[in-house]
Design a protein with these regions (language model features):
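Small-residue-rich transmembrane alpha-helices that serve as helix-helix interface/gating elements
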Residues: 90-94, 142-159
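Interfacial helix-loop-helix linkers and transmembrane-helix boundary segments
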Residues: 110-114, 137-138
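Conserved N-terminal alpha-helical segment that immediately precedes and caps sugar-phosphate-binding
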Residues: 11-14, 156, 160
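Transmembrane alpha-helices
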Residues: 118-127, 148-156
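Membrane-interface capping segments at transmembrane-helix boundaries
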Residues: 106-107, 160-176
Length: 176
């Protein structure tokens, strides 16, 4: 969120999410999966510090989302995207990239974690559909869907590549 805010200031653009969108993203990315993992029996001790854990999982995703914001800001005029259309793409891209991060955190996947992920995804889609007007999103046309898929693929590639680099670095530079 801080990186997106700084990016928006530097690019002289409005923040791409309204409070209600942030509430939904927070509930389905941070809230529900974190709450549900508490019910899983886990007696093993944390293997790495919170800083290293954050670098391993959150950092690649955060950079990927910021790069998607920058890419859409730069390409929106060329693609004839309105601000609302660009923000709609960013809303869905952020949600999917964040759920992908939850998948990585939950790995290795077991039945319980699979069910939690499926419930999280279905609930996010249903709530987004039910509250579509409140989310102030642009209608998803076939062209907008194509741009969304391209942005999402870009974000997934960036996130995956950065994740591999960060994991390699953390694995070759053990904790002190």
């Amino acid at each position: 969120t801080i990186l997106i805010s700084v990016t928006c200031i530097l690019l002289n653009m409005p923040y791409p999410f309204i409070p209600f969108q942030m509430t939904l993203l927070d509930n389905f990315v941070e809230g529900f999966p974190s709450f549900m993992i508490l019910f899983e029996k886990n007696i093993s001790k944390q293997k790495e510090s919170i800083g290293r854990y954050t670098m391993r999982y959150s950092f690649p995703n955060a950079i990927a989302i910021v790069l998607c914001v920058i890419a859409l800001k730069l390409l929106a005029p060329t693609l004839s995207l309105s601000l609302n259309q660009a923000f709609t793409i960013l809303y869905y891209t952020t949600a999917i990239l964040s759920i992908h991060m939850i998948y990585r955190i939950y790995s290795p996947i077991n039945l319980y974690r699979t069910v939690v992920l499926i419930v999280d995804i279905v609930a996010f889609v249903l709530v987004s559909y039910i509250t579509y007007d409140l989310l102030q999103l642009a209608p998803v046309t076939s062209l907008l869907l194509q741009y969304l898929i391209m942005t999402l693929l870009f974000g997934l590639i960036v996130s995956t590549c950065l994740s591999k680099i960060v994991v390699h670095y953390l694995d070759t530079h053990p904790q002190d």
